[in-house]
Amino acid sequence: MPNASEHSFPFPILIGDIGGTNARFALLTDAYGEPKQLAPIRTGDFATIEEAMQKGILDKTSVQPRSAILAVAGPIKGDEIPLTNAGWVIRPKDMLAGLGLEDVLVINDFEAQALAIAAPADQDVVQIGGGAVRPFHSRVVLGPGTGLGVAGLVYAQHTWIPVPGEGGHVDIGPRTERDFRIWPFLEPIEGRMAGEQILCGRGIMNLYRAVCAANGEEAVLADQAAVTTSALSGADAAAVETVSLFATYLGRVAGDMALIFMARGGVFLAGGISQKILPALTKPEFRAAFEDKAPHSALMRTIPTFAVIHPMAALSGLAAFARTPRDFGVAMEGRRWRR
């Protein structure tokens, strides 16, 4: 755990959520003000993140940030951090040398999502089903997106500690008769079926094609957006079943994560897919699958589940951390660079 002297960053602080398609930034001028949202930057529009930050942010504001706290999708090892789903490579030493920064911290993207669920505002979440939050108990966040992100959040020594991992790659298997009809048509990864093969954007298409194949039908919808839109409107029966099954399987995995972390503080669904298919998630299938964990179904009924509807949840989490770093046990060794 970093000591207290390590838990401070000079203001102004630039916070950033660096995704595969878009990079979203905000400026925090002090510990008391709200972050100033900046226009999103498409990662494909700039060759490097340094160029994007210079031309897309610094050249357009009179505020010179002294620190940067960035959340990225990718392993954080060494002085060069390649993004999982984009061409950029994060080089913190180059940021210190070329952008006038004094302090750079890089964390996992789902650590930021976990930070955001420490104290979410009521208007930023929608409860799905029953259960009640137990304060200061463990929490879990799952986010179907480009992949399936998972992180825990545990409270110890008066500190919220995010626990990132690769929970999206746990095994997932068939349980019902319908599952067994669909499963042979799902595309595995290296011979096995991981949660991320179904519970993400491309996973929706994997599941849709398998549903169509099990029905002996042609898959006519071309992409994830078409499937979810057709499902919510009821225009395509295979799409409706796909999204219903997606909600069921997400409920199963979310329930597993709740048991692993004993997440009496709640299980939170983050990301754009969860927001888009919220009408499907509020139907009985998700919550029924979540609670169907014999011999612990009674326990599961007490654990609340939520959809995060804040449009910039990761930035909200980063801002909370930047304001009061001592409230969070974010590991910094090997992930922080200073001049």
Curated annotation (Swiss-Prot):
A GO biological process of this protein is: glycolytic process
Q: What subcellular locations does the record give?
A: Cytoplasm
Q: Which UniProt keywords apply?
A: ATP-binding, Cytoplasm, Glycolysis, Kinase, Nucleotide-binding, Transferase
Q: Which GO terms describe its molecular function?
A: ATP binding; D-glucose binding; glucokinase activity
* EC number, UniProt record: 2.7.1.2
- List positions binding ATP: 16-21
Database matches in InterPro entries:
ATPase_NBD, Bacterial_glucokinase, Glucokinase
Q: Which reaction does it catalyse?
A: D-glucose + ATP = D-glucose 6-phosphate + ADP + H(+)
A GO term from the CC aspect: cytosol
User: What family is it from?
Assistant: Belongs to the bacterial glucokinase family.
What name appears for this protein in its UniProt entry? Glucokinase
Q: Name the lineage.
A: Bacteria, Pseudomonadati, Pseudomonadota, Alphaproteobacteria, Hyphomicrobiales
